[in-house]
Amino acid sequence: GHLSKELITKFNLDADSDPQAYGIGIKELWQVAPGKCKPGLVQHSLGWPLDTSTYGGSFIYHMDKDRVAVGFVCALDYADPEFSPFEAFQQFKHHPSVKPLFEGGEILSGGARTIIEGGAQSLPRVEMPGALLIGDAAGLLNLPKIKGTHQAIRSGTLAANHIAEKSNGEGFDSALRASPIYKELHKVRNIRPGFNKGLWRGLITAGIETVTAGKLPRTLHNHDDFSSLTKIKDLKTIERNWVETDLAPRDRLASVYFAGTDHDEDQPVHLQILEPEVCMTRCTEEYNNPCTRFCPANVYEVVEDEVADAGKRLQINAANCVHCKTCDIKDPYQIINWVTPEGG
């Protein structure tokens, strides 16, 4: 979260931990044609349409009243600057075994957000003067189980009891690390970073770590997601063989409507570019402006501008923002700062 980022930086809470790792999750709720939904059915996938060097997968949850939730999660340490997580999600929906479920249906809502994936080795110090980090703010998601709500509840309860007993937050970091909350994360600490070397090695690592319950005397490490992009000049051509899409939403701009976010067009821009001169110079030359692709809401757009030095400029369509914060994390120069929009 925005406040967590500020607090971690101000109090140097991550001095002794690995960089946090993130994924972008995109989700849609559909009303499907009668008879297609099987309430209670849960389907998960791994890999495609991602290449084997990129970690991620998809899910389909069959609910009541002919409703289906479908989603896609992709780790933000992917290397291809031309990659678009939104387009990858749409490709998943068009897989021959998936598309029939949605044909004849309609999308009801959608959205996107970043998911903390770092686990135990990326856990920052969770206490500071006047505040404690709990739940997702601390990064307590158990990624292999895709579960975090129980961790949020347990850490909140632990924090409340600690404050009630001590009247302050001193010692909470040690208390959390000695609790079942941390032990659960430590047990699976090597599964996510095991995929840094690719899908197949990741699956082998996950199997070993699961069988040994994380008891091997080693800890794999995470790296900054923004450091993983390959420069355009070094990029090898990737044949994705993606198909034309015809299911809703037809493009990123159309998807914004279903997210339900609401901004006044003239409100202050909450996406701050700290060094604007980098965008149409170094970023264009080195990465071809990846923000125009990693954003799932078409917030960043390169437009013609005769007045601009390069004849083009980066336009920020802040009203499109769905508050996923991918830009703040994935920008290779770390010059995009997401702040809370006017009105929240």
Language model features with spans:
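Predominantly flavin-linked oxidoreductase catalytic cores and closely associated redox partners
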Residues: 1-104, 139, 155-158
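A short alpha/beta connector and helix-capping loop motif
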Residues: 11-12, 121, 145-159
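Active-site-proximal substrate-binding core of FAD-dependent oxidoreductases
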Residues: 139-145, 157, 161-201, 309-317
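C-terminal auxiliary extensions adjacent to catalytic cores
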Residues: 195-247
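FAD-binding beta-loop-beta segment adjacent to the flavin cofactor pocket
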Residues: 112-143, 254-270, 278-294, 301
